[in-house]
Amino acid sequence: AKNCILRTVHFLAEAAEAAGCPRGAISAISTPTMEATQELMKHKYTALILATGGGAMVKAAYPSGTPAIGVGAGNGPAFIDKSANVEQAVKRILDSKTFDNGTICASEQSIIVEQAMESAVVRELKRQGAFLLNEAQTKQLGGFILRANGTMNPKIVGKSCVRIAEYAGLSGIPADARVLVGRETGVGEGAPYSREKLAPILGLFV
């Protein structure tokens, strides 16, 4: 991840400089440590901190003396109502959730659908490559998403649908499934599909 970020920053910095930005306007710490991060946050030329990457990072930013915005855990739902372009909405949700197999915490974690739109949304999800789990599959995968202590199972993180199905002991999952969709009715600790899932897994609420 560090090398990917540094390479991305390199390309962004090159493009920014070519567009007229001062050299070094975009940069990154090449060897990230908490000490280096704290030094950067407290530097007199740092005007604003956007802290993400875990609770410890957010807590370290607030007392730094620099204005800070803390980012919490990502668990964003997408709401599809009667006015929506269903094809476009589903495409954007699936494109977001399949990027890097769902490891981006800002990607959608569940879909909330108005009852009148349920059939159209389910049909479009299937057409665009999502796999709708049946009740038994939903329950089985739901028991695998979280560990006994209530935290996300690291075995699902960034894995393909087929690999997740293999780990969870699910059968009948097609090799070309883009996202696994499980119906959910509750929220919170006892509702795994309502939680953050850094994997191509979505909860469906109607």
Q: Language-model segments: what does each one mean?
A:
Residues 15, 58-188:
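ALDH superfamily catalytic-core signature
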Residues 44-46, 148, 201:
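Short, contiguous strand/loop micro-motifs
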